[in-house]
Design a protein with these regions (language model features):
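Ligand-binding loop in jelly-roll beta-barrel domains
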Residues: 28, 78-79, 89-118, 189, ...
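Active-site-flanking structural segment that lines cofactor/substrate pockets
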Residues: 29-31, 37-54
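Residues at beta-strand starts and edge strands
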Residues: 40-42, 61, 66, 100, ...
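Short, flexible domain-boundary/linker segments around small modular repeats
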Residues: 41-50, 156, 164-180
Length: 217
């Protein structure tokens, strides 16, 4: 079945489990946020231990990740809190490592987590779709009214990715102080949210703290 409705949920209430899938090495731990039991697609918060290394390679699933805390080295670059990556299926990343350890949000969108050791992209990879950005420093906040009808004023977004295959969008959002919206809304697509920082209040579900998550089919 597809991913079930998950709400309310806070990953701070769960313990990390060791990642034991082939190719990911040792020193990677995860908290499962949601999973499609048919395809293996899932979202996880991941803790890399200090000294963690993963060989160059690609995944059979497209995936996205953003650094929540600490520093992650991708090849010879050091990526800090807020750095976001969209990685198409078959796109080979260089070695990743973390000297001091870091916390990362991972979203495998089309299949289960996998790592195929390689220094070249798969021939079918849509390499032109790959991108990464320091979302905290290099993208300005914009009004959240990307669709009509829209959210109330005071909800701001930073668009991180638009997927031309699925039309899915990934963005950061923030609620400014005293933001308030008292209407119930729904979407014609699945909706997923993870609280990187701060606390909000979600109607019948109450307060959602840092680490709060939902998946709405």
């Amino acid at each position: 079945m597809a991913r079930p409705h998950i709400e309310p949920f806070c990953d701070r209430d769960e313990h990390f489990k060791p990642m034991r899938l082939l190719g990911f090495g040792t020193g990677m731990h995860y908290k499962m946020l949601s999973m499609d039991t048919d395809t293996g697609a899932c979202s996880m918060t991941v803790q890399f231990d200090g000294g963690y290394k993963r060989t160059p390679g690609f995944s059979w699933s497209e995936y996205e990740f953003i650094v929540i805390e600490g520093e992650l080295k991708v090849g010879d670059r050091t990526c800090r809190t807020g750095h976001y990556f969209y990685v198409p299926a078959g796109y080979a990343l260089p070695e990743i490592s973390s000297d001091q350890g870091c916390l990362v949000l991972y979203m495998y969108n089309t299949g289960e987590p996998s790592h195929e050791e390689a220094t070249e992209h798969h021939p079918s990879a849509q390499t032109q779709l790959y991108h990464d950005v320091d979302s905290y420093m290099d993208i300005p906040w914009a009004a959240g009214n990307v669709a009509k009808p829209s959210v109330a004023s005071g909800c701001m977004i930073k668009l991180l990715n638009y997927n031309p295959n699925s039309f899915a969008m990934t963005f950061l959002y923030c609620m400014t102080p005293n933001f308030y919206q008292d209407i119930i809304s729904y979407h014609d697509c699945a909706e997923e949210s993870y609280h990187l920082w701060g606390t909000s209040w979600m109607m019948q579900f109450g307060y959602v703290p840092t680490g709060g998550y939902f998946w709405r089919p």
